[in-house]
Amino acid sequence: MKKQIVLLVLLVAFALPAFAQRDTIRSNKNEFSFGYGYMPSSSFRWGGGLHYYPEMDYFGSFYATYTNRLTKVIGIGATYCFDPRILNYSEKNQPICRLNESSYTLMFHLKINWLNTKYVNLYSKVGQGIMTWNYHLIEYQPSLYQINMPSNDFIDRIDYAYQFTPIGIEVGTKQYAGFLQIGLGMEGMISIGFRYGIIDIDKE
């Protein structure tokens, strides 16, 4: 609960200057974004009772978002994230197992455009939702080491998901733009991608 309150307070702090903005230039009613994020929060969610996997061959989040702009400043939408990773576990340099794990996330988000120019857009975003994950254990050698794996019950594999992006930048045209954002959550600490906006014909 404290985490949700902190996210809300931070969002309001970033949103206040945006509400005073009136001379926005770029605005699409519907926007789609596709990105890749480095080090999503699912990659460091391990808690007490779970084993630590010191070697990670690969991790990162691939995500897609849809945003419906209520105004030129405020947009709401949904985000889907897919986070595959391969982890190796060893004891004293002796390989024990290889773990293929994936996370699947659905979040609803609020996006605030607090600076708009013809070719550059700055924004902040916050999202909350749920995450589920699964895993597949391969190359396991139980004779060397016994591993207490997480529960296979679906209800035990559901967790809280979030994304807080204090700063993001889009560079391009009203319809096509690349973006870079810095934040914390399921979209990664640093992420890059592409944004496509559907231009309203009646506004052209």
Regions found by a protein language model. Give the residues of each.
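Sec-dependent N-terminal signal peptides
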Residues: Q4-F14
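Sec/Tat signal peptide C-region and signal peptidase I cleavage site
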Residues: L16-A20
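Gram-negative (and chloroplast) outer-membrane scaffold detector with strong preference
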Residues: P40, G60-Q141
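Extracellular loop and loop/strand-boundary signature of outer-membrane beta-barrel proteins
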Residues: G48-Y52, K92-L99, P150-I155, A177-F179
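Residues on the lipid-exposed face of transmembrane beta-strands in outer-membrane beta-barrel proteins
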Residues: F34-Y36, A64-N68, A78, L106-I112, ...
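Residues that define the transmembrane beta-barrel architecture of outer-membrane proteins
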Residues: N28-N30, M56-F62, N100-L106, V120, ...
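Repeated loop/turn-to-beta-strand initiation elements of outer-membrane beta-barrel proteins
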Residues: K72-I76, K118-V120, T173-G178, D200-E204
